[in-house]
């Protein structure tokens, strides 16, 4: 081979390597760096939780991620056929507002499974009830979590903020949204006089607000006759309503109460008592820190009006540890600063990397520890 030919081969090989680097999959890059960081701190292997459109569109390399040891659990799928498509693509679970529909699709897929391997995979499939399963009950309330458990969801997915007293309060927005919540005293409550979680104590939140409004669709019900466990638990806890904003530690107590309700309590003779108690006794909690990466938007309505990553970790992971839930809880976030801190400070608690637009998986939106080589 001539010197010029060798030089040419070397040149084009370098071009090929450079091109490959340019088109490297951002989800794979992120999880490889996240996996390295977790391993360095003896933390659990992180999980990728991408928006379902990036799974269905082929942007997320599901099989390649799984081959490297990373589970893939997309959000938020409510259409049965899209559920079925992703199940057949091999995802490890799905986050959904309609766990009832997902369970039906899974039942059909399990019945048609051809191999033991496929049956085993489907038996492990994670049914994660988004905000408790808001398609059936007012979101992120005790009745929604009860409904999620009634549907035999294997995970309760929810959101958290931090109150003035450092409590991990459960709510999706950084403020108590008037679309879902009303004031218990009947006073007007709108977007204009909204209350941010960082500006109220957990006790005052439970005295002031009732979040029983329905607005998600015709199947979302706020009929308390459908939520006997939440009603009994609210009475036990001295709450003004089962629909008051709840918090992480209280949710843990509620699920324990749910198990006891169906094992030895008022629901022990229910036709579904045994399966409900058994499922709830091992149900997991996927708790999001509602914090966005700094600089992701300059829109005042979407800026962070909450505490910083460390206070989120202190409140949420503190509640998880205090209640002995490290083996059943995970922390998820779009703000990877939170997840880095969890891996460093609470290595027994798994982390879920929430992703949307792949353009946000590079640059300043990603903590330095998780950036691919050469990324600024």
Language-model features and meaning:
Residues 7-16:
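Bacterial N-terminal signal peptides
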Residues 1-4:
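Positively charged n-region of N-terminal signal peptides that target proteins for export
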Residues 19-376:
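Phosphate-group recognition and catalysis centered on beta-loop-alpha active-site segments
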